[in-house]
């Protein structure tokens, strides 16, 4: 890499914030291997028909690329509201470049110096990273041994720390655990600020597992965040969104950058929503593959967390890094994340899962 003639100049020579010194950026490996099962992507690409429709939409949008996009993303927000249901309207919806930008805007608006964000870990690793990036104090509360959130302990933690933002992830990443609505309600009733229910994997929930969308009318401090990266198989589009009281949307508009959602992004996302039935048709297949994987892992002596997502957390391994590397050596990329002794695998195609099963048995000496 070029040093532009300044030999020896490094990040340490920059006026970096003290709390960022020595930190590492987020990064999941991006490798070309037989089975990519590490970032919880939907393994099924869009159909040729949808690819063509997206191409047409992008071409139509390109005609006006000399102009800024719709700053409010009005049509997209209405389409997202229609998809969500639960009486949600465009005024209740906000969209951004991936759900991470949604979470960042929430912390920009409600966090910052002198404010706290509280989460129940192990959980989504970006929550504390985004908190740090917005100079929000992060408070970590441990989950139970089975990766649940104890409602009484959670309420006690909220009352003790008085956070401006509480993060609840349901289904939880990396464990796959979904929260009962009663737990969310108890925390929402106790919280002095907003409660963000991160539902990135909501479409993969098992039958009977509720969404916090049903709480929005009762609890105006509840925010439900979603994404089109998982069930919608649109990770490359970078489209996240939330549903909340209109006052929350008004607050986020104070911190959003102008014209933050490009014309092309809006056009592609709108097209994907018109093909929602087709895109979501793979969800049932992935659920069935997930449940079969859970049964297989348990039958082979592994400990497995119940999952309502498109991934499975399994263990336990005295040296999980060695198992991870053995799998990678066989062309299978999973994720070394979450509590020690555990690994996470994304649910892929039947062919990818067959490769994973064989590789795992070899890696653990059970072949």
Curated annotation (Swiss-Prot):
Organism: Thermobifida fusca (strain YX)
Stored NCBIfam families: hisC (TIGR01141), PRK03317.1 (NF002877)
PANTHER family from the UniProt entry: HISTIDINOL-PHOSPHATE AMINOTRANSFERASE (PTHR42885:SF2), HISTIDINOL-PHOSPHATE AMINOTRANSFERASE-RELATED (PTHR42885)
Record lineage: Bacteria, Bacillati, Actinomycetota, Actinomycetes, Streptosporangiales
Family according to the record: Belongs to the class-II pyridoxal-phosphate-dependent aminotransferase family. Histidinol-phosphate aminotransferase subfamily.
CDD domains to which the protein is assigned, alphabetical: AAT_like
Gene name linked to the record: hisC
Co-factor requirement: pyridoxal 5'-phosphate
Keywords of the record: Amino-acid biosynthesis, Aminotransferase, Histidine biosynthesis, Pyridoxal phosphate, Transferase
Catalytic activity: L-histidinol phosphate + 2-oxoglutarate = 3-(imidazol-4-yl)-2-oxopropyl phosphate + L-glutamate
Molecular function (Gene Ontology), one example: pyridoxal phosphate binding
N6-(pyridoxal phosphate)lysine, modified sites: 230
HAMAP family xrefs: HisC_aminotrans_2
Entry-linked Pfam families: Aminotran_1_2
GO terms classed as biological process: L-histidine biosynthetic process
Annotated pathway: Amino-acid biosynthesis; L-histidine biosynthesis; L-histidine from 5-phospho-alpha-D-ribose 1-diphosphate: step 7/9
Enzyme Commission identifier(s): 2.6.1.9
Keyword Amino-acid biosynthesis among record annotations: yes
Self-association and partners: Homodimer.
Name of the protein in its database record: Histidinol-phosphate aminotransferase
